[in-house]
């Protein structure tokens, strides 16, 4: 299955249809009042798909989403109601809110709607049948009843004529709203379509040289990712906390009290062997910004491979020589996939290499390269320095993009209809 062979919203006729869209409105709410949205980015991201459905004559546009982790029970703290005023403001039109996401009353509201009426359903996760489980009073997982799950899925299916999935962030979860809506046409919205197109660009037909930049703390967390990428890439920059496991294991560099992944150290040799087999150039850091504690006000120092990091100090960023070699590798690449920052960028003294890597990535885009940032921390980096629109693609799904890059099939994508040949 190619990632680009799936039916998309532009392939289907929406005129006079009830268009059921799975969106990701899992927005952060102000902890004090629980109704103010602190970052509306996810709502803004869904607007092109919602507007397209309205502009193309949909009878009604029904939006379903989750918010937080209510664990299969109704909880006002996680209501989607606070989204309504923001959505009205952004769309410039009325939005009806339903107090549940399935059932006769919801069906009645949906079936009465016309003229592209937008309807937002209450949180899907108020029902244990959405995720397939709930938690009891002691916090233990309780599996949802199989028949109840089937009924819930039937209830969602009853609300639409066409299903659109625009929630890439949950595409790696086989939840009812992702895989259980049984309509003849199931298509991707613009957000999911863009994600699939860019990941196909990297994983299926990359322009070469193809570079992957991988950070993060543990080698063992990234092993599937590295394994899947090694046969595909031309170069690999290994940075962040996990680089110390490579340096100590392969070159016996003194790493002080830096992160060391015992389990990961056993596979480092295999990774390097596999890289050689596939002619992949592996770039590791050669110098470090060090600190006497994990804090922004730590006493800082500098160490090279030769000196090693002294006892009582840990590496929290890479140094200028490393950055130079990263920049050079980035500049000579045509496709760049970046997953994991080089340093603890949340703390100013250890953000320099991350910022420099981002600048090099932006420069690469300006020179015609494709740069894809794979969600999670690296997406936060792009947002922090206002570079989201200067990168070819910043993924909206941390876990989902990681699973794609590990070579796994995403249930929410697999469930979509194929384009007819």
From Swiss-Prot:
Biological process terms in GO annotation: gluconeogenesis; glycolytic process
Transferase found in the keyword field: yes
Binding positions ((2R)-3-phosphoglycerate): 23-26, 41-42, 65-66, 68-69, 124-125, 172-173
Residue positions binding CDP: 216, 221, 240, 340, 345
Binding site for Mg(2+): 221, 377
EC number of the protein: 2.7.2.3
Subcellular location: Cytoplasm; Mitochondrion
Keywords, ordered alphabetically: ATP-binding, Cytoplasm, Glycolysis, Kinase, Magnesium, Metal-binding, Mitochondrion, Nucleotide-binding, Transferase
Keyword Cell membrane applies: no
Biological function: Catalyzes one of the two ATP producing reactions in the glycolytic pathway via the reversible conversion of 1,3-diphosphoglycerate to 3-phosphoglycerate. Both L- and D- forms of purine and pyrimidine nucleotides can be used as substrates, but the activity is much lower on pyrimidines. Negatively regulates the biosynthesis of acetyl-CoA from pyruvate in the mitochondrion.
Subunit structure comment from the entry: Monomer.
Record-given protein name: Phosphoglycerate kinase
Organism per entry: Emericella nidulans (strain FGSC A4 / ATCC 38163 / CBS 112.46 / NRRL 194 / M139)
Gene name as annotated: pgkA
């Amino acid at each position: 299955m190619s990632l680009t062979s799936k039916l998309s919203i532009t392939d289907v006729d929406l005129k006079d249809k009830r268009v059921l869209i799975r969106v990701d409105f899992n927005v952060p709410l102000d902890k004090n009042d629980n109704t103010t949205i602190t970052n509306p980015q996810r709502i803004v991201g869904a607007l092109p798909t919602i507007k397209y459905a309205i502009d193309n004559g949909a009878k009604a546009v029904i939006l379903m989403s989750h918010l937080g982790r209510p664990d299969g029970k109704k909880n006002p703290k996680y209501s989607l109601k606070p989204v309504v005023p923001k959505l009205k403001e952004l769309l410039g039109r009325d939005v009806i809110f339903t107090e549940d996401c399935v059932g006769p009353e919801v069906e009645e509201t949906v079936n009465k709607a016309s003229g592209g009426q937008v309807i937002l359903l209450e949180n899907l996760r108020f029902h244990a049948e959405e995720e397939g489980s709930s938690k009891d009073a002691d916090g233990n997982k309780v599996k949802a009843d199989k028949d109840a799950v089937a009924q819930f899925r039937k209830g969602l299916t009853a609300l639409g004529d066409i299903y659109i999935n625009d929630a890439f962030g949950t595409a790696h979860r086989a939840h009812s709203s992702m895989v259980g809506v049984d309509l003849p046409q199931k298509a991707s919205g613009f957000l999911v379509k863009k994600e699939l197109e860019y990941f196909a660009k990297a994983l299926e037909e990359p322009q070469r040289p193809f570079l992957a930049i991988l950070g993060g703390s543990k080698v063992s967390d990234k092993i599937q990712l590295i394994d899947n990428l090694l046969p595909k890439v031309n170069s690999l920059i290994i940075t962040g906390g996990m680089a110390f496991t490579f340096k100590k294991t392969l070159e016996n560099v003194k790493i002080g009290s830096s992160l060391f992944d015992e389990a990961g150290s056993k596979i480092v040799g295999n990774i390097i062997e596999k890289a050689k087999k596939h002619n992949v150039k592996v770039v590791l850091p050669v110098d470090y910004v060090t600190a006497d504690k994990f804090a922004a006000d730590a006493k800082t120092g500098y160490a090279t491979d030769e000196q090693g990091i002294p006892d009582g100090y840990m590496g929290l960023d890479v140094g200028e020589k490393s950055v130079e070699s990263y920049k050079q590798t980035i500049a000579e690449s045509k496709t760049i996939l970046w997953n994991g920052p080089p340093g603890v960028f949340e703390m100013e003294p250890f953000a320099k290499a991350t910022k420099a890597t981002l600048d090099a990535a932006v420069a690469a885009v300006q020179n015609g390269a494709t740069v894809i940032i794979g969600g999670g921390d690296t997406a936060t980096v792009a947002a922090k320095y206002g570079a989201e629109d200067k990168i070819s693609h910043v993924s909206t799904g941390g876990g989902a993009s990681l699973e794609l890059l590990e070579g796994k099939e995403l249930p929410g994508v697999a469930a979509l209809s194929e384009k007819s040949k």
